[in-house]
């Protein structure tokens, strides 16, 4: 069950886009509250997502005036979703299962301060998914989400379906599982 009005609207969508994912992370996961509760990190090595949290970033041109612009800016600020090299966010672009897993991975790296989470599963042999080689750019994120019970492959086929869409209900279930993983109660 969604915890917010925005989550309720997204729950009924057949597929979610980058703007919807921004709203889910900001409203349902309460990313700002989560980040405020984390202890300050000392200097040293930072992942690309962590570097984004300390830099001042401008709002992407295609997010300005978008209905979800404040939520988009929030997930960009924390490095959960990124702006493309062209400076655009593409808020209406559909999110795939692989992209969702990548966003979850970035959050887990920032929340746990465990940089090894970004590379822990690359090169596994054999691949844990029948449809994804362990050399796939998002393999590590998919394996991390699967290992932690946040996202699962198909029980019958073993396929993760990285290019498949995520509907609103599944997106919210993933967020609830992620909240439980982080032991969050908001």
List each model region and its residues.
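N-terminal propeptides
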Residues: 1-186
